[in-house]
């Protein structure tokens, strides 16, 4: 079992456990150059809010600072944006789904920024 398969197995188990809780899920996906965050409905079929480093406003803000979005500063910005969008959609608390990625670096920065912006998990 290679690294990718192990990550996907961990992600699958996490999603099964979150589905049993019947709460909204904040899912994070990370690539070398970008980071994505989505809030799914409790049933898991609808995306209620999303934010990523591919959005025009985010790219414009990151162009002033550094790089495209593969860094902690970009992850912090996405964490704040997803929390704002989730609260606007009426979601106060979520279950955090790190998609098998380690809670470290960009994933941790996104989670902490979302918490600071008022999202509870």
From Swiss-Prot:
GO terms for cellular component: cytosolic large ribosomal subunit. InterPro entries: Ribosomal_uL18_bac-type (IPR004389), Ribosomal_uL18_bac/euk (IPR005484). One of its GO terms (molecular function) is structural constituent of ribosome. Pfam families: Ribosomal_L18p. Keywords: Ribonucleoprotein, Ribosomal protein, RNA-binding, rRNA-binding. One of its GO terms (biological process) is translation. This is one of the proteins that bind and probably mediate the attachment of the 5S RNA into the large ribosomal subunit, where it forms part of the central protuberance. Part of the 50S ribosomal subunit; part of the 5S rRNA/L5/L18/L25 subcomplex. Contacts the 5S and 23S rRNAs. Belongs to the universal ribosomal protein uL18 family. This is Large ribosomal subunit protein uL18. It comes from Burkholderia multivorans (strain ATCC 17616 / 249).
């Amino acid at each position: 079992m290679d690294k990718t398969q192990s990550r996907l197995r961990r992600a699958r188990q996490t999603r099964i456990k979150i589905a049993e809780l019947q709460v909204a899920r904040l899912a994070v996906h990370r690539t070398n150059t970008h980071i994505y965050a989505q809030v799914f409905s409790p049933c898991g079929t609808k995306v209620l809010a999303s934010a990523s480093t591919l959005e025009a406003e985010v790219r414009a803000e990151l162009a002033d600072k550094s790089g495209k979005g593969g860094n902690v500063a970009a992850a912090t910005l996405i964490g704040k944006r997803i929390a704002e969008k989730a609260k606007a959609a009426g979601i106060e608390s979520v279950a955090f789904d790190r998609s098998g990625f380690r809670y470290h670096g960009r994933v941790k920065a996104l989670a902490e920024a979302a918490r600071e912006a008022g999202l509870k998990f």
